[in-house]
Amino acid sequence: METNVKGEKDKELELNEVTMILDVAAGVIEKVRTGEITHITTVLNDDNQNQILENADGALLLTIEELPDTYHGCYLYNGGEFPYAIKGSLEYLVLNDGEGQSLTKIIGVGMEPVKRFRFQGPDEPSVEDPEGDSCIWEIQFEVAPVLEEPRHYLMRWNPSVSSFKEEDYQACLEDMNHGMFRLNWSISEWQEARRGDVFYMLRSGDEKAGIVFSGMFISDPYPADDWAGTTKRRMYVDMVCMNAAAPDEEPFIPLEKLQKAIPAFEWAKGHSGVLLPDSVWQQLSELWEY
């Protein structure tokens, strides 16, 4: 499957096996954009199994040690434990409501058996059975909108003073889901921030200073208690974090390189969650892609 969908401003995203197109009802796209809808569900079947599940030339890969006596295709119940692997390359859903399309980023996947039946062999009719060895699996994609014109923010992290320590970062990397982990983070210039905006995380305060991961906001800003323990309130955003450098590795873009390539911006000092000017984030994105 190949499609071109508008992503960042004036940029065509060429998507093939990393995306899947799903038809949705009218109004769903707008509700995904606002966050009223966060999950898109579909049932696993013979038509979409190769798009959703890891497979080798169409043969589904099972994640269980004990194989069933008969072939169930994508309908194996396995005691209610999902026996397949979600395709690691599947990153996006394109939502189609009949009038337009919208690109969304997959940020989580859930699976649930919704109807059980008894497998009677190839070419034999299936019989619905609450104790059956087969089932229809519902796949729940958690998504966030990929905006055509996202704003770009610089978040800052100093492990020596932050409540988020280096060991917390390591734990996040060891517990990633679908290649991502989640954080909430304070944002100083929050007034224009919205769900779907892009961020870069700048580590500071030590010899590993530089951009260490990127991601997107999956909430609008909201108030909460100060992470530093003061009585004042701060604004925060929820984020999914991707493309992360290990704590013992060099940052993807060292601070010295940032300062040399984009000297007009103050990288070494400042608050977390500052809105980057267009000229700055465009240069930064070129460094990131390079």
What is each stretch, according to the model?
Residues 82-146, 212, 216-280, 289-290:
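Aromatic- and Lys/Arg-enriched surface recognition patch
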Residues 98-100, 203-208:
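Short, charged beta-turn/beta-strand-edge "cap" motif at the junction between a beta-strand
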Residues 159, 203-205, 219-221:
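Short, flexible loop/turn elements at secondary-structure junctions
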Residues 189-204, 223:
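Polybasic, glycine- and aromatic-enriched phosphate-binding surface used to engage nucleic acids
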